[in-house]
Regions:
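Long, amphipathic alpha-helical coiled-coil segments characteristic
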Residues: 1-33, 37-40, 59, 63-86
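Non-catalytic connector elements of ABC transporters
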Residues: 40-41, 47
Length: 86
């Protein structure tokens, strides 16, 4: 789980940077990376959210991105709190 924490924070920052740059394809690519690692540690809610970002990013669906993105950091935060408590 320790190998998940820092990379996940970095990928979330990539997604935020891509959002600021209005680069939907980069959001999709970063969402794909975090989706896979989230699923591998059992963080299914985060993985599902990242799957949405991957799909909407690849489709350049800004409405979908705008709906999903605000949930990213709070969801990751809950997972990181849980991991730190182990």
């Amino acid at each position: 789980l320790g190998d998940f924490v820092e990379p996940s924070k970095e990928i979330v920052q990539e997604i935020k940077d891509a959002y600021e740059a209005r680069d939907a394809k980069a959001i999709g690519a970063a969402g794909h990376k975090l989706k896979s690692s989230s699923r591998s540690v059992g963080a299914n809610a985060l993985s599902d959210l990242c799957a949405t970002l991957e799909k909407t990013g690849k489709a350049e669906d800004w409405d979908g991105i705008d709906d999903a993105l605000p949930h990213l950091e709070p969801t990751l935060g809950l997972i990181l709190e849980y991991i730190e408590g182990l």
